[in-house]
Amino acid sequence: SIKFYKNGEGIILHEKSVIAIYNKSHTFAVGNEAYEMYEKAPANIQVSYPVKNGVIADIGNMQSMIDYFFHELDGKKKLKGAEYYIAVPTDITEVEKRAYFDLITNTNLKPKKIHVVEKPVADALGMNLDITKSTGTLVVDIGANTTEISVMSLGGIVLSRLIPIGGNRFDEAIINKIKKDKSFVIGEKTAEEIKMTIGSAYVTDESIDVCGRNLVTGLPSEIT
């Protein structure tokens, strides 16, 4: 997902990092609206994720998405000429960091200044953690495709690792488990709904009703 935070106001935008392209050239929808089309869009509309494994995989679509969000926000929030901070993973190259920097540079917002900061530091500050102490602070950030695990102390990052496992892998595990145990197929969005609704690191008695396809009968069905 993508979040915009404005000093003094808090989070002013929180949307899925998804874009829908019509006929390979026109932006049809972005953010949560595009995500709702995932697995449902017709053949002439491609729904994709411009960011994969913490880096920009499709710079053109990413720029289109950022431009759209800024256009929607600028009239309400007066973002032109502001100072921008971009949070990026630690384990990416300088070229990949530069791509994030260029996203803001290429908008029409005329930013006063752009800072690229490491995501664990931004996470810790967002949670009001004091990372200036000599005692270590562990921050685990689980994203869609990656998980970043960092230890911070004395105002800096002591150790950080980015592993290629995130929420999407959890969704995949849910899909495979239900398919194996129930002979029932669900989509990625349904798997995410299960994860967000009753997902837990501990065993619970919670349940949820979901729709999908019964592999035995081949018909749409519902299970708990």
Predicted regions and their residues:
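Nucleotide/phosphate-binding catalytic cleft detector across ATP-hydrolyzing
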Residues: 1-142, 152-224
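Conserved Rossmann-like nucleotide-cofactor binding loop
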Residues: 145
